[in-house]
Amino acid sequence: MAQDGVELEKSVRRLREKFHGKVSPKKAGALMRKFGSDHTGVGRSIVYGVKQKDGQELSNDLDAQDPPEDMKQDQDIQAVATSLLPLTQANLRMFQRAQDDLIPAVDRQFACSSCDHVWWRRVPQRKEVSRCRKCRKRYEPVPLDKMWGLAEFHCPKCRHNFRGWAQMGSPSPCYGCGFPVYPTRILPPRWDRDLDRRSTHTHSCSAADCYNRREPHVPGTSCAHPKSRKQNHLPKVLHPSNPHISSGSTVATCLSQGGLVDDLDHLILEDLKEEEEEEEEEEEDGGPRE
């Protein structure tokens, strides 16, 4: 797919995500082709149309800017705005975020136990789903209290702040005073790009199978450090993601498959290629795959 095709697909997916998938791919594609992939302008014009057509007192709470005249008068935009009515307390925030060109997103960890594959993705906050690149199955994120990786610690005893490999809920000794400290959060890979910020300390924790175990250890616990996992012949996945059961409303967006390290355009091309392959397989098999 050419670069302009990638830009068109990105704009279609972003426009659809702004309105939580309520704009069909066909309508979004037509609008993006008509207005040069300007998802920001079209999104704001749709919000303006909703505000003008709604007529309720609630519409006064929606801060909608006056769009360009060609978009304001466009019948396709007006039709989409009409289809999104009525304005309610529940969808007011969606329209306001679309007006502000915002798509709330979060960085989440995913893990496929079948492939022993772990990855991070920035996903839309309202629909946290990602696909394993190896088996192509879709998964929910790893629960927040089960995440593992590079963790951030704040020692309550000596006030020392440090980083180290851990799983949420498993204590590690403070490098300053040795006091057992629980991690406050797991950091996405991009947080560790700056080599100067990496810890110079050798990993050590209280897990029973840690390669550099600190005593007293905690029986029945497992070390999250890759070296311990490899040394003990354990899988990379400490806690698997649950398979995603589709409700039919998931919007495949550039955010939903946007890697934290990889190039965005490459990922969208890869995502489109995978979708084409899935469609071909469905045709060959005579129906959709489970």
Swiss-Prot record:
Residues 102-150 are annotated as: Interaction with PABPC1. Residues 51-71, 221-242, 269-290 are annotated as: Disordered. A motif (Nuclear export signal) lies at residues 261-269. Keywords: Antiviral defense, Cytoplasm, Nucleus, RNA-binding. Belongs to the SHFL family. One of its GO terms (cellular component) is cytoplasm. It is found in: Cytoplasm; Nucleus; Cytoplasm, P-body. GO terms for molecular function: ribosome binding; RNA binding; sequence-specific mRNA binding. Interacts with PABPC1. Found in a complex with PABPC1 and LARP1. Interacts with ELAV1, MOV10 and UPF1; the interactions increase in presence of RNA. Binds to ribosomes. Interacts with GSPT1. GO terms for biological process: defense response to virus; negative regulation of translational frameshifting; negative regulation of viral genome replication; regulation of translational termination; response to interferon-beta; response to type I interferon; response to type II interferon; response to type III interferon. The lineage of its organism: Eukaryota, Metazoa, Chordata, Craniata, Vertebrata. A motif (Nuclear localization signal) lies at residues 121-137. Inhibits programmed -1 ribosomal frameshifting (-1PRF) of a variety of mRNAs from viruses and cellular genes. Interacts with the -1PRF signal of target mRNA and translating ribosomes and causes premature translation termination at the frameshifting site. May exhibit antiviral activity. This is Shiftless antiviral inhibitor of ribosomal frameshifting protein homolog. Its main location: cytoplasm. Residues 272-290 have a biased composition (Acidic residues). InterPro entries: SHFL. It holds the Pfam family UPF0515.
